[in-house]
């Protein structure tokens, strides 16, 4: 995708862009996917801010790296999509809007490795940040449900933290979408 954008930028700068070809279609699809992904993240965050404003704090917070020395050059920013907090409980949600919520290798469906590594890293760094306080930190990968036959809906206990992977069905009436989001908050925060 980066090469595609670079190539299009080059053609535009050089004045060589003349047609609405497959390249333009791919670019528009890419931009639409990026917008939809951001919209999905923002929808979930704003839903929790509005519907649980007096019960849960909802933000898109940065999580500081918990380093053993002061060397932090070249480390990426850990920017959560959604971080929900209530008292001593924290739920970090990484919202994923993909065409395929699972990867398939050798006819076996598995979670996207990079997504799992990302949420695990967020959770463990937040856990360590709060080590001096009584707390519980959990993570969730929340995929927009696709039309695939197999989709994730699992809860894992990893190194002392709960990591949940589930889907949000956006093809339902809004009241049922809201019920799905409410259930996440109610179960996690015992509301």
What role is predicted for each listed range?
Residues 33-191:
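Catalytic core segments in nucleotide and nucleic-acid processing enzymes
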């Amino acid at each position: 995708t980066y090469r595609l954008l670079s190539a299009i930028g080059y053609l535009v700068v050089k004045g060589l862009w003349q047609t609405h070809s497959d390249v333009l279609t791919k670019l528009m699809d890419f931009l639409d996917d990026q917008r939809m992904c951001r919209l999905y993240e923002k929808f979930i965050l704003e839903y929790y801010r509005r519907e649980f404003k007096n019960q849960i704090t909802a933000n898109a917070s940065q999580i500081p790296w918990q380093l053993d020395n002061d060397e932090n050059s070249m480390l990426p920013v850990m920017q959560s999509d959604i971080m929900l907090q209530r008292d001593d409980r924290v739920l970090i949600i990484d919202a994923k809007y993909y065409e395929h919520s699972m990867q398939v290798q050798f006819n076996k469906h598995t979670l996207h490795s990079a997504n799992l590594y990302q949420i695990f890293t967020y959770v463990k760094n937040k856990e360590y940040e709060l080590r001096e306080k009584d707390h519980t930190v959990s993570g969730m990968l929340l995929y927009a449900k696709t039309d695939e036959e197999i989709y994730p809906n699992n809860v894992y206990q990893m190194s002392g933290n709960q990591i949940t992977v589930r889907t949000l069905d956006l093809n339902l009436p809004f009241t049922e979408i809201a019920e799905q989001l409410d259930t996440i908050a109610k179960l996690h925060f015992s509301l």
